[in-house]
């Protein structure tokens, strides 16, 4: 198969004639029951039900197959499973490879619900979790136990945005245990700014809700796996009843068509805002992977092909409750909301003690309020003016 640049892949992948049936876009095929014309057809579908043959709605329709094909071509995987949200993609990927008595290595700066899953669900299953500092590097080898089955990465880290030395971590882990299953929450890079499977990672997970969809109106999760792990991931996720509706799959594929131009704009605008913030007296540190002030910046330059729109910055002081309200409640363009990856700019505030509470296993010397922003497609100078007005409200 001819290898294309990503901008071409975004447009053309997942549009085989079987999926499009003569139209530009893949068909939107909503179905639970799929009809067999004969006993032989039923036997064939049953035999190949895990290989893209129409069998039953839970296995997928042409709409799902088109998105899975697109994702595999984007990320270089052997297969892609679709989930109703990113959290489902994370939890089912882990559950596919662990059992009672096993051990998981988890980034201590991972997405809070991922840590909650380990602390509540895995603990109930008597599966132990050890949290590691994402900047651990080769010392990850010292944490691997005989029963360690999964090493989970996140790049960059949630909120504090550290970039781990992924090649060093992966090499060290595989030196101790070549069969360990390594997976990564790769949402920030949209699965393409960091090519996980090319770095000997087994499974690349995304909350497709973010950049793949790109419009803050669909929830979906994806897990793209290599050949070694695909069959087990697929069958376990199927047995757990994981699936996504055809409309969400269709809308996600449509969103990916513009992913290239969207990521370029997110990068350009976010770096401009980040550089402006780094010059403001109210700001102590900017945690944008593309800036030298971000821990792991050198690994970002080496391993990533670009930046997206999410980053954070620490203020020089811890805001009082009144200052937080004054700062956060009156933005004209920034919206206060969870999630990110859409066309709109978002903002959230965390206090140092809140970060310490959700990161009990790693220590960061945060003293000022931590502001997380996602830079959307508004005029970047107007976004900067909106932030400047916010600083004036806390002066």
Show where each model-derived region lies.
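N-terminal glycine-rich, Lys/His-bearing helix-loop that initiates the first secondary-structure elements
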Residues: 1-50
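Conserved PLP-enzyme active-site core in the AAT-like
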Residues: 10-19, 80-279, 287
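Glycine-rich beta-alpha junction loops
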Residues: 15-17, 30-36, 188-190, 210, ...
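Conserved N-terminal alpha-helix of the aminotransferase class I/II PLP-enzyme fold
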Residues: 38-88, 114-120
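Glycine-centered tight turns that cap/initiate beta-strands
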Residues: 76, 147, 282-285, 369
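PLP-dependent enzyme catalytic core of the Aspartate aminotransferase-like
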Residues: 119-120, 128-130, 146-149, 262, ...
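Short, well-ordered beta-strand elements within core beta-sheets of diverse protein domains
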Residues: 252-261, 308-317, 371-376
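Conserved small-domain helix->loop->beta segment predominantly found in fold-type I
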Residues: 271-332, 336-341, 355-362
């Amino acid at each position: 198969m001819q290898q294309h640049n990503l901008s071409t892949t975004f447009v053309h992948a997942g549009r085989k004639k079987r999926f499009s049936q003569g139209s530009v876009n893949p068909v939107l095929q909503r179905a639970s029951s799929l009809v067999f014309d004969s006993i032989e057809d039923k036997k064939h579908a049953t035999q190949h039900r895990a290989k893209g043959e129409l069998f039953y709605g839970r296995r997928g329709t042409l709409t799902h197959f088109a998105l899975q094909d697109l994702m595999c071509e984007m990320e270089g995987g052997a297969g892609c499973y679709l989930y109703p949200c990113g959290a489902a993609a994370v939890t089912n990927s882990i559950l596919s490879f662990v059992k009672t008595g096993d051990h998981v290595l988890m980034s201590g700066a991972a997405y809070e619900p991922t840590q909650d899953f380990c602390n509540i669900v895995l603990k109930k299953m008597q599966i132990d979790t050890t949290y590691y500092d994402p900047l651990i590097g080769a010392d990850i080898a010292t944490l691997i136990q005989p029963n360690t089955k999964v090493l989970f990465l996140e790049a960059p880290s949630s909120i504090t945005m550290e970039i781990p030395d992924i090649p060093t971590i992966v090499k060290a882990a595989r030196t101790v245990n070549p069969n360990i299953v390594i997976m990564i929450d790769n949402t920030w890079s949209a699965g393409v700014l960091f090519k996980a499977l090319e770095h000997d990672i087994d499974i690349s997970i995304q909350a497709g809700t973010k950049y793949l969809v790109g419009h803050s109106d669909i929830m979906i999760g994806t897990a793209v796996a290599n050949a070694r792990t695909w069959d087990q991931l697929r069958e376990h996720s199927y047995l757990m009843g994981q699936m996504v509706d055809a409309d969400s799959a269709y809308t996600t594929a449509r969103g990916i068509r513009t992913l290239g131009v969207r990521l370029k704009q997110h990068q350009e605008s976010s770096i401009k805002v980040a550089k402006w913030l780094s010059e403001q007296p109210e700001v102590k540190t900017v945690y944008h992977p593309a800036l030298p002030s971000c821990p792991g910046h050198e690994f970002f330059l080496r391993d990533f092909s670009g930046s997206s729109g999410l980053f954070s910055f620490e203020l020089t002081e811890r805001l009082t409750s009144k200052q937080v309200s004054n700062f956060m409640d009156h933005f004209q363009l920034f919206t206060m909301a969870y999630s990110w990856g859409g066309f709109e700019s978002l903002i959230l505030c965390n206090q140092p003690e809140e970060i310490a509470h959700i990161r009990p296993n790693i220590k960061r010397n945060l003293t000022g309020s931590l502001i997380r922003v996602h830079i959307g497609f508004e005029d970047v100078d107007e976004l900067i003016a909106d932030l400047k007005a916010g600083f004036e409200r806390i002066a």
